[in-house]
Amino acid sequence: MAGDCAIDTEKYSLLEDFNVDVEVENKAFETFSLCFWVYLLDSTTYPSAIIRQVHSDMSVSAPFLVLDENKKMMLLPLTLLHREAPDPVNTSSWTEVPNVSTTAKFPLQKWVHVGCEVSRNYMRLYICGELVGEQVLTSLMTNGTNSDCARKISLFSVGGDGYSVQGFIHSAEVLPSNLSASYHYTKDPPLWLSVDKPSTSGIELDEDGVWSVVSGTFCSLDVVLTNAIGQPVHKDVKVVASLLYADSGTHVEKRSDFEAFLLVSYEGIELSAEDKPCNLLNGCASFKFKLSQLSSKSDKRLFCIKFEIPEVKANYPFLETVTNQIRCISRNRDSVSSMKRIRLGEEKVSESKIVNGNGTSMEWRPQNHEEDNSSTDSENTEMRDSTAFRRYSIPDWIIFKYCLGNLTERALLLKEITNNSSDEEVSEFADQVSLYSGCSHHGYQIKMARKLIAEGTNAWNLISRNYRHVHWDNVVIEIEEHFMRIAKCSSRSLTHQDFDLLRRICGCYEYITQENFETMWCWLFPVASAVSRGLINGMWRSASPKWIEGFVTKEEAERSLQNQVPGTFILRFPTSRSWPHPDAGSVVVTYVGHDLVIHHRLLTINHICDSSERYTDAKQLQDMLLAEPELSRLGRIIRGI
């Protein structure tokens, strides 16, 4: 098992499997120290024996280390060494004999280091390397005892009876007299997975200790892998999240034809949490998650999120962790005020426009890296000046539901609308959403929905041939053919780096599923559609200069612009914008400002020219870009080897 995982699980064993023999010589014996890390599960009966003792003259074992009725740990004398040793049968004698006890309750479901130092005339108890007590005892060894006889005592744990606890033990060792318990405490601490304090954004802590989150809103928290003394552990492992009911601990099962209830964001792409493990980096995995389509009020239940390491196959509770109970609040409670905000269009984004002689305009504004939880992502207010509403077959509440929904909710709604509505009705729906939201780019995404879904379904059927999992190498050819056809550009193929980025967006490795493909397609199709139109098509075709160097991440662009002169810029398609986000398929300008800081601005081209103008318009867009005072020189992508 340990060979398949970066975590050596063979170091951890059940407490009931613990067994160690200690030889006690009559004259030469001085002292021994038994040290170990223990993780105790809850027990139903107290007092309970953690470790018991037995030797050849005993027919029944006696307790050595116990939890008393108050859950305090007690170290008891050895029957082979001390006159004060407890009666093996009479449990009441455990508290009557001299012992060493902790002053506080022993913590359960947590790693604790225990050290038991035993000599002829005393015993000491250490907790986490610190001495908590000492007891003077009377030795059974006398000078008249046969010095050639070495006695052995067995220390062990059992499970299943009424006087034992269940748990795990790590690094149990009998130390020689020259080594201390504090030495063992820092030698090889066990590992511990836990949830760090959540960020204040998106999570509220109620008075009852329950987290309150709004359904459909992204929240952030960190999961950390440390050792038991709090030091971060650098292991090449992944952590996966799953949603549970807080009362029963059972998984919240996905309903048929619905998206997963627990989603995570990876480079702006929403994925099912159970399908997208997160890498630990320097002992920490940062999760950006949201709960979708859930309400604690309607479901009458609280939830929690469980994090675990999938490579660890056995059930080790210390290598998994659960959040506080979560109260999921439906977004519908704010629907009235949200609809009013959308109608009034109170949220505006500052922008500057460049207009050329042909009436083509280009919006130039900061790129918003937040998730799409607002109704207006790209502002274009000319739709507000339209005439009164036309007679419309799709009801207003569907329009409001779309405007208020997140990306996943909008995608599901568009699939339903395109299946049950004509092209004219879909077009009218797009116009109405644009009018209510004040954002015409919503209309672009709605009008491409039918073609995006149909093309994507056809592409997957050709790729999969009814197989659930398809090797990535068999996918790339079909993806490239579809992209070049939709983009109306047969002269430029996708590169190896382009496919690497597409695979990252998919969230897959060697094999791709339909869910992986659909995630990628929702990003690729709007990009291909944008490339097919005049202004972008000419720039995509251009080889010298190469205005768009393929599919580029934000990090690659920033790295390429390090140490470049102000005004140097790179054009890229943002990986955080997927259909039906209103800015899907847009272009981002990443550039070095006069302040020597790298900036990102979203370039939204209105009234995009027909594809027949694709060759003549590249120069026009070039002039529009270079006319900006912040832009003066096209940069190049520098990728690591």
Swiss-Prot record:
Residues 547-641 form the SH2 domain. Phosphorylated on tyrosine residues. Keywords: Phosphoprotein, SH2 domain. GO terms for molecular function: DNA-binding transcription factor activity. It comes from the Eukaryota. InterPro entries: ConA-like_dom_sf (IPR013320), SH2 (IPR000980), SH2_dom_sf (IPR036860), STAT (IPR001217). Residues 355-384 are annotated as: Disordered. Expressed in roots, leaves, stems and flowers. GO terms for biological process: signal transduction. Gene3D superfamilies: 2.60.120.200, SH2 domain (3.30.505.10). PANTHER family: SIGNAL TRANSDUCER AND ACTIVATOR OF TRANSCRIPTION (PTHR11801). This is SH2 domain-containing protein A. It comes from Arabidopsis thaliana. The lineage of its organism: Eukaryota, Viridiplantae, Streptophyta, Embryophyta, Tracheophyta.
